[in-house]
From Swiss-Prot:
Subcellular location per the Swiss-Prot or TrEMBL entry: Plastid, Chloroplast thylakoid membrane
Keyword tags: Chloroplast, Membrane, Photosynthesis, Photosystem II, Plastid, Reaction center, Thylakoid, Transmembrane, Transmembrane helix
Assembly and binders: PSII is composed of 1 copy each of membrane proteins PsbA, PsbB, PsbC, PsbD, PsbE, PsbF, PsbH, PsbI, PsbJ, PsbK, PsbL, PsbM, PsbT, PsbX, PsbY, PsbZ, Psb30/Ycf12, at least 3 peripheral proteins of the oxygen-evolving complex and a large number of cofactors. It forms dimeric complexes.
Protein name stated in the entry: Photosystem II reaction center protein J
Protein function: One of the components of the core complex of photosystem II (PSII). PSII is a light-driven water:plastoquinone oxidoreductase that uses light energy to abstract electrons from H(2)O, generating O(2) and a proton gradient subsequently used for ATP formation. It consists of a core antenna complex that captures photons, and an electron transfer chain that converts photonic excitation into a charge separation.
Gene Ontology terms describing biological process: photosynthesis
SUPFAM superfamilies with a match to the protein in the record: Photosystem II reaction center protein J, PsbJ
Major localization listed first in the record, in broad terms: plastid
Membrane topology label: Single-pass membrane protein
Organism of this sequence: Glycine max (Soybean)
One Gene Ontology CC term in the entry: chloroplast thylakoid membrane
């Protein structure tokens, strides 16, 4: 692994980013399905 001193490990950034993106997409589709996002 590369030197991660003083930096956040890249795999943590990737994991958090992936979960955030999936969460936002899930909320968007859930809102659209519920009719809450139909006005966006």
């Amino acid at each position: 692994m590369a030197d991660t001193t003083g930096r956040i490990p890249l795999w943590i950034i990737g994991t958090v980013t992936g979960i955030t993106v999936i969460g936002l997409i899930g909320i968007f589709f859930y809102g659209s399905y519920s009719g809450l996002g139909s006005s966006l």
